[in-house]
Amino acid sequence: GSPACLEPCRAKPIGLAVPVRSKFIRRSIVMNQNFTVRKLARCAVVAALYVVLCMALQPFSYGAVQVRVAEALCLLPVFGAEYIVGVVLGCFLANLLGSTIVDVIFGTLATLLACVVTYKLRNVRFKGLAIVPSLPPVLFNAVIIGIEIAVMFPDPSSSAPLWLACITNGISVGIGELISCTVLGVLLVKIVETNTSLRKVFLEA
């Protein structure tokens, strides 16, 4: 062939590739938008649920002796990083509405650290149960909130030294977290993992 017939031959596939590539880009943008919307919706629902549980069970959700049922949601990061935002936001709002500014700061910090480490341990299972991922909320809250209560809200009737008050409060908070996270939270994860409908709600991208 002559050079004259080669030029249109080269131009043809280029012209065909443009609409195909554009269609692929448009589809990718739509998929990413849907993915983002789902994540935002999950964050909003989890945050709202956390606040509602704390407000509805307020006598048990605050103080040195507490079983904050909403803390079971701290196990949700095993299903995805987006749940970290939802749980932390919920904790922040719940503390803002029902506790002091000190608890807003340190309580939210404890929940943030706990959720991040829980996410890192999301694939660890003990006999099929998410027991190991449930431990970070217990430990972080026991240490941080235990110290917070001992330092910022000391018992005026107690003559115990500060270090003992920290340990005592830490144990009290830790027991509550064990009930909320290692019992209720692990149960929540197991129910979601074994239920097809719930898996679609919590895990579908």
What is the meaning of each model-derived region?
Residues 40-44, 82, 86, 103, ...:
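Small-residue packing motifs within transmembrane alpha-helices
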Residues 31-85:
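Hydrophobic transmembrane alpha-helices
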Residues 50, 87-95:
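Small-polar-interrupted transmembrane alpha-helices in polytopic inner-membrane proteins
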Residues 1-30:
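Short, Lys/Arg-enriched N-terminal segments with co-localized hydrophobic residues
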Residues 77-87, 123-130:
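Membrane-helix interface "capping/anchor" motifs
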Residues 59-64, 72, 92-205:
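Membrane-embedded alpha-helical hairpins and interfacial helices in multi-pass inner-membrane proteins
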